[in-house]
Amino acid sequence: MEILKFTIKGSNAFFKKPDVNTYLYLTYGNIHKIALIGILGAILGYCGYNKNKLNYMINKKELKNVSENDFPEFYDKLINLKVAIVPKSEYGNFPKKIQTFNNSVGYASKEQGGNLIVKEQWLENPKWDIYILIDNKQAKVIADYILNKKAVYIPYLGKNDHFADIFDSEMFEENQIEKLYDTKKISGLFMKKDFSVLMEEEDDEEEVEYEELYKYEEKLPIRINKQTNMYELESFICTNMNVANIRNQTIYKVGKENIVFY
């Protein structure tokens, strides 16, 4: 067993929520699995959402199976990756800001003057440690590209305005990895359905250093629905509070971090 670890960051990031109104586009508070495998797909040169699906199916010699609901190539090939995401922030999420754009091309808006004002919510200075379980051929290819600093396309954080910086890549071998089942602390994001967050017990010892507790929770995309091509969401949590492993999930101790793959 091997685990690849690397860090990814950027000045800004924008992981668009599909449930938005006309003028303000919101972002998810963290990178999610679909966005992450999209970045990895770009590194490997796989087709994305905007690539002509017909070309993809011709390359696969399955032209007769073309339909509107075929998944992007990166999703087909990488959705089975086991990943863990650890936000490198004080409270599990990142500051956000609103960025305003003017689109003055004539066809952009039916309003007088043809000027469309668009507002986007961006994450500021996001940074994550990413872990990938090396248990299949695609994972091995990704490890080769990341460790050797190779990429077919430039990776970016949700939008091509936000370039991704990938660094500090390393491989952990089996003798550097420990499997846990009863630990009370999880580093990074985990599915809410797998763990129960416990209330902290008060400690009577005055000398114990106080740690400010936090709990970040958000519904994040975990897969794409075959019929609708829309995100399917799961509730994720990131916390420094104690947790109970209620579904007997395997926890991996890698370096100083306890992580859960999904």
Language-model features and meaning:
Residues 75-82, 86-262:
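Internal, well-folded beta-alpha domain core
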Residues 1-23, 34:
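N-terminal, Lys/Arg- and Ser/Thr-rich interaction peptides
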Residues 8, 36-39, 122:
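Long, contiguous hydrophobic alpha-helical segments, chiefly transmembrane helices and signal peptides
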Residues 18-102:
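Glycine/small-residue-rich interface belts in oligomeric ring/scaffold proteins
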Residues 13-15, 45-50, 137-140:
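Primarily extracytoplasmic ectodomains and periplasmic/lumenal surface modules that are beta-strand-rich
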Residues 15, 21-31, 131, 239-242, ...:
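Bulky hydrophobic/aromatic packing residues
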